[in-house]
C-alpha cells in the first residue's frame, strides 16, 4: 500500500485504509465484445464492492486508474500485470476516520412533500 500511495497525491490514504482492491479485466476471456462490456462489468463490480463495504460499516473510496494515465504504469509494475490484463479501478477499504454523514432520508424529499418555508 505504501508503494501505491506514492504514485498519486489522491492515494495518500491507502496505508491508513488497510486494504486496496485492484479491479481488472482479462481482455482474453469471455465473448469477443467491445472493450466497453468489460469496463461495464468491472465498474458494476466496483459499485457492489462500495455498497458491500458500506453495509459492513466500512469506509471505501473508488480510486481511478485510467488506461493511459500516469498511474497505470506503476500499478501494472507493482502487481506484475501482463499486457492482456486491463486495470479498471481500485477501491481503498478500511475503517472510516470520521462518523458517516446524515442519511439521505434526512435531506432528500420527494417533490412537493417538504415545505420550502415560504
Language model: regions and residue ranges:
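Acidic, surface-exposed loops and disordered segments
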Residues: 1-118
